[in-house]
Amino acid sequence: MSRVLHPFVLAALLAILAPCVAGATGAFNQFVGLGDSTLDSGYFRYTSTGNASADAMVASAIVGGAQGGWAGPGVMTTTFLAARFGLSAETVSAGGTNFANGSAYTAPLSATAGGSAAPGGLSGNVTTTQQIANLLAATGGVANAHALYVVNSGNNDLIFVQNQGTAWIAANPTFLNGVASEFAASVATLQAAGARTIMVPNTFYTSTLTGSGGIVPASNIDDYARAVAYGMTKWSYLMAAGVRFIPADLTSVFQFVATNPALFGFTPSSVLSANAPSPVAALVTTWADITPVQLQTSLFVDGHHLTTAGQKIESDYETSLLTAPSLMSLLAEAPVQGGLARAAVIQGQIDLSGQHRGPTGVNVWIGGGVGALTLKNFSGFPDVSGTPFTGSAGVDYQMPFGLIVGAAFTAGTQTQHFSIGGGQFDQNDQAISLYSAYQAGPVWGNVVASYGWYQDKIARDVTLGLFTDSNSADTTGSSLALALRAGGDIHLGPVTTGPVAGLVLQRVRIRGFAESGTSGAQTGSNGVTALSFGEQIRDSAISQLGWRASIDAGRWRPFVEAKWNHELVDQSGRKVRAALTSATAAPYSMAAAPVQSDWATASAGTSYKISERVMVRGCASATAFDSQMVNYGGDVGVSVSF
């Protein structure tokens, strides 16, 4: 009897362990910042500016509360962004991997051909292109493929050109194009060395040029247009160089902030660079120059650099660009789990119909189920969790020689809530299935082929500081599935037990779609955080190997099954494509949420014979040993023979 009880005990153990899963791994294991003061988290706190007087001012400011970065005593966007993924944005001058240093140019700049070129506004600056070279030199020419690289450079290039005057600008119309070319070539070397996730913002410098209500004064129109064009040029040159990067449209985001200040806790005057509270540069701004309240209620510290509130808006936006594609990948993952559940229900009804068959050979059945499904993401990325509901109905016929053929219809619905940031997706699905089964002595087998279609309604909230931009979209999808299952029965008195093996093949297709957001009503576009997503295809081939047992106890027939599942299709290379809707830029791709390749499933239940023609069946199941998923639930059904 111990051999019979073994699968029951194993199944119960798996069910108990099912909710106990480990956390997901991180998408990134390092943060690397490259650029200027927009990213600098404290470079000159630990090294010289190249000017003794400036060094003394920095040292004094640190005593007064300054952090060494360019938000005064506030927090930099790099610190926020890295911390979101459990990483450090410590400056390279203190042993970290944030190479950015305030006042740096993209490349050495000179106003005259052949003239002495400067690395930035400070003699101690290191240009962005040199930062990349220094990084690769320090790593032996190999870039960390699992790092998050943010390359933000160009504001100081714009100021350099602006300071040369109208005549010089007219005489050197392609000057910034040349700088952009050097920038693109440098970032291309970073990618060639192995970097895979590279974010490149355009600029928020445009918001230092706007007046009340976000309107650009006539005196700043040329400078504003130049800043916008420079951002587009850098992206264009990166595309031409074959660099795969994530474009961050800070220009549109901060233009939206400037025109809607109240949404972010600002006033029409406190978003103006001219009204920045600090009388000194952000690098040396202390608590004597700015208050904690002003760091939250003003957009700029000193007219050029963002306060803590502004830095948080930027990091929130950039976080959304990084996490949205993998979050949307779960639109295709939920149907895979639904397909497994659908196949299991139909296979259970095949088993039930085999226990009673009327003189006509026809059985009709109906059933329904409810479960709990949590799909996990990378750490720091949103997970989803919800309650799937399903209902199925079918009819089958047993031919004189024993072959069973049947058809079923299944419908389901679920709302999957996002764990971070708010939002959800509602997924409705329908499927038509054809199935067949046959048993020859102790050996049995069945096959279920299904075609399904899906309707998704997505609501994705993006937090930008105090404001939440609610994006929404609708899309549809389809699936093909083939479930094969076979086994052998060993009869030990009232007990029937034996091995079971299966293979479930699925292809899920989710059509591409574009979001529209709350901010779109003010901008006349889709919105500043709205994205479009490309078509997704999720292929799955899951092998199953296990053992089952049942006991014939009169009208009751309790059963249990435990099996090991293995995903044969490598999911590590699956990516989801996304694109900005607020600006013209190349689409980018991010890895889909990770999927466990091995896990266990346990199920237990019973059938009950109400009469010679009517039987009912109930089953509960759960998964275990899957760090990326929590899945459990139950279903009940009734079968009538004719």
Give residue spans per PLM region.
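Conserved active-site regions of diverse hydrolases
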Residues: G23-R357, V370-F378, V636
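Short, Φ-rich (hydrophobic/aromatic) sequence segments
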Residues: L17, L340-G348, W564, A620
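N-terminal, well-ordered alpha-helical segments
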Residues: L10, T79, A83, T97, ...
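Bacterial N-terminal signal peptides
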Residues: F8-P19
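Membrane translocator/pore-forming domains, dominated by Gram-negative outer-membrane beta-barrels
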Residues: G361-F642
